[in-house]
Regions:
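Extended interaction regions within the primary functional domain
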Residues: 1-2, 20, 116
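N-terminal start-of-domain structural block
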Residues: 2, 29-30
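Hydrophobic alpha-helical segments, especially transmembrane helices
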Residues: 9-11, 31
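Short hydrophobic "helix-edge" motifs at membrane interfaces and signal-peptide entry regions
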Residues: 10, 16-17, 77
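Bacterial N-terminal signal peptides
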Residues: 14-26
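Long, charged/polar, soluble alpha-helical segments
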Residues: 31-176
Length: 176
C-alpha cells in the first residue's frame, strides 16, 4: 500500500507539473501571435468610362470638350466627397481614379490640338479648376483613414503637378 500511495503522489505531482508547464507555454505561444500591420489601399484604377469617352469624342471643338471634361471631373469629385462623408472609401477612391483620368485627358487633348485659337484660355480654365480642386482633395484627405489617405496624398500631388503643367502651357510661347 505504501508503494501505491507513493505512485499516486508521484503521478499527482507529475500531472500538476505538466499542467503548470502547459499553462506557462500557452501564454508564451499567445504572445508570439503574428501582428499584421495595416496595409495601404491599392491605388485607384485610372480610366475614363465608356459613356464619358463617348461624350468627349462627340464634342464639337476643343472649347466644348474642355468644358465637358471639367464638368465630368467636377461631378466625379463631388461624388467622391459625398462618399468620403459616408465613409465609403473604396467607392470614393474609384471615383477619384476617373477624376484623375479626366483631368489628365483634358490637358493631353489640348496639347495634341496644338496652338489653335483659344487654347490659352482653355489652359487657364483648367488651371483655375485644378486650383479649386486641390483644396477639396486636401479636405477629403484630412477626413480619410490612413490606409486610403496615401492615395489622396498622391492625387493631391498630381493635381498640383497638372496645375503647374497647365500654367506652364499658359505662358508658353507656342500656345496662343
Amino acid at each position: 500500500m505504501n508503494r501505491s500511495n507513493l505512485y499516486r503522489k508521484r503521478l499527482m505531482l507529475l500531472s500538476a507539473l505538466m499542467f503548470a508547464a502547459s499553462l506557462s507555454l500557452s501564454s508564451g505561444a499567445r504572445a508570439q501571435d503574428l501582428v499584421v500591420p495595416p496595409q495601404a489601399a491599392p491605388p485607384p484604377m485610372v480610366y475614363i468610362p465608356k459613356e464619358a469617352r463617348t461624350q468627349l469624342l462627340s464634342a464639337r471643338d476643343e472649347k466644348a470638350r474642355t468644358r465637358l471634361s471639367l464638368e465630368l471631373a467636377e461631378t466625379r469629385l463631388a461624388r467622391a466627397e459625398q462618399q468620403t462623408e459616408l465613409k465609403q472609401f473604396n467607392a470614393a477612391t474609384a471615383d477619384l481614379g476617373v477624376y484623375q483620368a479626366l483631368m489628365e485627358d483634358a490637358l493631353q487633348h489640348l496639347y495634341r490640338a496644338g496652338g489653335t485659337g483659344g487654347s490659352r484660355d482653355l489652359f487657364k480654365r483648367i488651371e483655375q479648376s485644378l486650383h479649386k480642386h486641390a483644396a477639396r482633395v486636401e479636405g477629403m484627405r484630412r477626413t480619410t483613414p490612413g490606409e486610403f489617405a496615401g492615395n489622396l496624398r498622391a492625387l493631391g500631388k498630381l493635381v498640383r503637378d497638372l496645375r503647374t503643367e497647365a500654367l506652364e502651357a499658359f505662358y508658353d510661347d507656342s500656345i496662343m
